[in-house]
């Protein structure tokens, strides 16, 4: 109990100025019309959006597109914060997506932070009051915690971090997007046959890594999966709020497209 109490009792370190809060949230388009319709317009400020899926499903690409589109809504004293824990950030890809836009200095508006430990990842969040970001991206949120912690301590440390993120999203009116991995979980099923009623078979189910802990502090959850790898067609499934709806889109050089090649 003492160990659990140590993880749960901590200061947020944020000073809140409620006078600066917006009357209405800002909705950041994703770059895909079908995905925007699924999300009710796009990614909203004041919410933590969890985007998870297998490797190559477009999680980082979606984050890059959000950075480009978010730049259109930035005020003079606002920025975009991109916290990279696995080395996925590609400035040349962000510039490629923004090439069609009149805003050619998109990279100047992105504060890039390469975190090599959970301490660095957590410290980056403390910079929110001075940076005043409109969008915060953490790609990926759970990776460093999986390396440094084990068992219950891993979940408690992650939930502590996510609680601060949720607190920041609500009180600083910023959109927070985190990405996450999936893992295969073995399922054991019992089959009843004429000769043996205890026959078991092993199968696997894909689940979000540390999904239970992440879900507690996520306001929206989006699962990405590959529909057609050759044509770069991705399916986005809205998992929370529970609608069980989906939208398909393609990854192209300028970002996303809703037109499919038959």
Give, region by region, the residue ranges found by the protein language model.
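The Walker A/P-loop phosphate-binding site
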Residues: 2-102
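Conserved P-loop NTPase nucleotide-binding/switch module
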Residues: 136-164, 182, 191
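Catalytic-core regions built around general acid/base machinery
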Residues: 70-73, 160-171
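Hydrophobic/aromatic beta-strand patches that form the interior of the parallel beta-sheet core
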Residues: 49-51, 81-83, 111-113, 177, ...
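Amphipathic alpha-helical transducer elements in NTP-driven molecular machines
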Residues: 28-32, 36, 45, 91, ...
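A hydrophobic alpha-helical transmembrane-helix feature that marks the membrane cores
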Residues: 43-46, 62-63, 67, 120-127, ...
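Conserved inter-motif catalytic segment of the P-loop NTP-binding fold
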Residues: 76-152
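Phosphate-binding/switch region of NTP-binding enzymes
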Residues: 167-262
């Amino acid at each position: 109990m003492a160990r659990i109490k140590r993880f749960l009792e901590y200061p947020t370190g944020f000073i809140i100025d409620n006078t600066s809060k917006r009357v209405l949230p800002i909705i950041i388009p994703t770059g895909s019309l079908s995905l925007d319709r699924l999300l009710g317009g796009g990614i909203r400020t004041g919410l933590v959006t969890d985007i998870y899926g297998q490797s190559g499903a477009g999680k980082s690409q979606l984050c890059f597109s959000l950075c480009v589109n978010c730049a259109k809504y930035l005020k003079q004293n606002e920025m975009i914060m991109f916290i990279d824990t696995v080395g996925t950030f590609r400035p040349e890809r962000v510039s490629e997506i923004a090439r069609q836009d009149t805003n050619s200095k998109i990279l100047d508006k992105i504060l890039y932070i390469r975190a090599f430990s959970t301490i660095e990842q957590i410290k980056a969040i403390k910079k929110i009051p001075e940076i005043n970001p409109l969008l915060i991206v953490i790609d990926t949120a759970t990776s460093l915690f999986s390396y440094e912690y084990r068992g219950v301590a891993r979940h408690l440390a992650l939930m502590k971090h996510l609680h601060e993120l949720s607190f920041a999203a609500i009180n600083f009116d910023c959109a927070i997007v985190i990405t996450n991995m999936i893992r295969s979980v073995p399922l054991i099923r019992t089959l009843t046959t004429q000769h043996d009623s205890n026959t078991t078979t092993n199968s696997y189910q894909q689940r979000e890594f540390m999904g239970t802990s992440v879900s507690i502090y996520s306001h929206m959850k989006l699962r990405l999966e590959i529909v057609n790898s050759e044509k770069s067609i991705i399916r986005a499934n809205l998992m929370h709020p529970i609608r069980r709806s989906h939208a398909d889109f393609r990854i192209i050089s300028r970002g996303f497209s809703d037109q499919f090649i038959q």
